[in-house]
Amino acid sequence: MPNKNRNIRQYEPKVLVLDDDFDLATLVKQILQKDVFKNVFAFTDPLLALEHFRINHKDYSIIISDIRMPTMNGFEFVREARKINPKVKILLMTAFEIDDKEFARVLPKPKIDGLIRKPASSKEILNIVSTVIKR
């Protein structure tokens, strides 16, 4: 007889968290894993995260990425991730004020699904991620 729990586990959302600040990437991962999400992978290096995503792109439901990072910013990361998997949901995080016109200029085609403004509470992060996953 098939194990029903095993089938359910296969459909749990897999989340990629990317922030060059190790403590923040780890904190977001812990927040998500504490309540809802079991499959959360955190990265501090955009190039390493992109390589991992390239290999495992079919498994991911959502990417949460900081915008301002060295070597590759969040907008560049999103463009590359969308080339690999156009259906993955994208949340960007920033501590800076960014208006809709700037988003449209910098990221005209590959839209994002939401924005997390830092600092954000655990509750805010969970609410935003849960809402985007359900869409």
For each feature predicted by the language model, list its residue ranges.
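Non-catalytic signal-transmission and effector/linker regions of two-component phosphorelay proteins
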Residues: 1-16, 26, 59, 121-135
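Two-component/phosphorelay signaling modules centered on CheY-like receiver
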Residues: 22-41
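Acidic, metal-coordinating helix/loop segments flanking the phosphotransfer/catalytic sites
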Residues: 42-62
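Acidic catalytic/metal-coordinating carboxylates
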Residues: 45, 73-76
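Active-site residues of response regulator receiver
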Residues: 66
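Receiver (REC) domain active-site loop signature in two-component systems and cognate sites
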Residues: 69
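Alpha4 helix (beta4-alpha4-beta5 surface) of REC/receiver domains from two-component response regulators
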Residues: 76, 97-114, 123, 127
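Hydrophobic/aromatic residues positioned on beta-strands within the core alpha/beta folds
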Residues: 93-95
